[in-house]
């Protein structure tokens, strides 16, 4: 009887974990019609970038400013170029997935001094920014 209870408890725990995992996956999935703001930090000689500060301080600061308009954000660390011998073109790329681009621009405009002052704390790179509308999401069904 105890073995049966333990087995049922294990099944319940696995079910709970898979539900939470599925919910988290949905939270981190962009949607068609959303906007992706890409902040690219070019890799140039003499430039500095503090990835730890970027991850632990700057991006959470930005997420707080963007509020509910931000669905989620991503951080990429550049590790290579097109070929193994190519220098990495960007040391980092940050992505904000937002529902409303007008609201994004409004928040950034209202907080530009805070954002620029924080930028100086982790890099001397002038970022390149691109805002895109997500037009299509498609899984690769090829196996």
Where are these regions (language model features)?
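Macromolecular interaction modules
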Residues: 19-143
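Bacterial Sec-dependent N-terminal signal peptides
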Residues: 1-27
